[in-house]
Amino acid sequence: MAKCGSCGPGYKSPLDAMKGPREEIVYLPCIYRSTGINKPDYLATVDVDPKSPSYSQVIHRLPMPNVNDELHHSGWNTCSSCYGDSSKVRNKLILPCLISSRIYVVDVGSDPRAPRIHKTVEPYEVFWKCGLANPHTSHCLGCGEIMISSLGDPCGNGKGGFVLLDGETFEVKGNWEVEGESAQFGYDFWYQPRHNVMISTEWGAPKAFALGFKMEDVQAGHYGHSLNVWDWTEHRLVQTIDLGKDGLIPLEIRFLHNPDADQGLVGCALSSSIFRFYKEKDGKWAAEKVIQVPSKKVEGWPMPEMPGLITDILISLDDRFLYFSNWLHGDIRQYDITDTRNPKLVGQIFLGGSIQRGGPVTVLEDKELECQPDPVTVKGKIIPGGPQMIQLSLDGKRIYVTSSLYSIWDKQFYPDLLKEGAVMLQIDVDTKKGGLKLNPNFLVDFGKEPDGPVLAHEIRYPGGDCTSDIWI
């Protein structure tokens, strides 16, 4: 989205982005894999303009040409990292498929309200050219290429490498990393060129998580617990930071948006902790735990203690607030991170989860709550599942949230979600003193989709957002 005759996509700076227009539509993948409905996953377009007659409704569905892909995350062909290049246009959404290893390129430029398939990258191209599989996070690079992280090799073993796509033809160019430099596991990544660094995170071996979560797989070393530090210029793995038992399964990673910043935050799902990572005086990188969500002692659940399971985090464009979701406990939290070493909890809201009152789980010991939260009802619907993917408006005043994590894990931890479908909700944010409040007028009920209940995951704005765009 150009702002002048001589500039490229996105915004000049994160603070400029905060002044961008209010979101009117969003894109999000909807997943049928594991639900028992043999239909393709699809990209949904949702109207989020309160002035529109189709507000909080799905206005378009783009089915993929195959079944059982497991659409998951998405990225752009170009973004604010190419702001200085007026020849670049943000008009293609990149959709890596977590299980099939396909990569779909979707044209959202010709008609933003009715996207269409532009190209399909078949799995064998990723397998043969890169030796990788299970693509996850897609980021556009300042050079015009597209970089996609991988979780494994074609045999289902863990392998943290990166696929490069040509930004014009969308052909697989090969690996970003130097040959032999892959990490043990992969997941998310964020780059900060002014410090010549990229840091990637670790979920686990696809052959482990693909069949459901087992604590024995964690104990057997099939899940990650490290941050991998890469030399951005030389494409080499130069350091691995072991987060230990307090940093099991580090997923979403965010540098501060200021391109000069030498620090950021990462959410560790299983340990339910937030680590701050930072550059030391000698140029090495280090990490320290700054937030810990206590587990709850429970009965009526597969394990005696229930972690929060931090599955998504994001940072506001002014680098003032951190938000994250506890998928199992059922809450979203807002922290003031003016002092990144000492985050301050300023907002919290419960939206379903596994510990709500009246459910099968009884909390025996809770270090935070005096009683179990009540179920949440929006427009007459009791919200199933727990809050998972979150997206913040450019101005920081609205959060959109969906409830699906990954179809097999949804089936394991929230089986009713497959019967009722996911939901998309909207939260109003107090950006002055902190605070989160549910918007009672917004509900997208994916249980009422034409082909049956569906799972909905990551949310994207057409003009970019605080998790898609990186400033260099």
UniProtKB/Swiss-Prot annotation:
GO biological process, one term: protein transport
Pfam families: SBP56 (PF05694)
Gene Ontology CC annotations of this record: cytosol; membrane; nucleus
Molecular functions (GO terms): methanethiol oxidase activity; selenium binding
UniProt-listed SUPFAM superfamilies: 3-carboxy-cis,cis-mucoante lactonizing enzyme (SSF75011)
Superkingdom of origin: Eukaryota
Pathways involved: Organosulfur degradation
Compartmental location: Nucleus; Cytoplasm, Cytosol; Membrane
Membrane-protein topology: Peripheral membrane protein
Record's protein name: Methanethiol oxidase
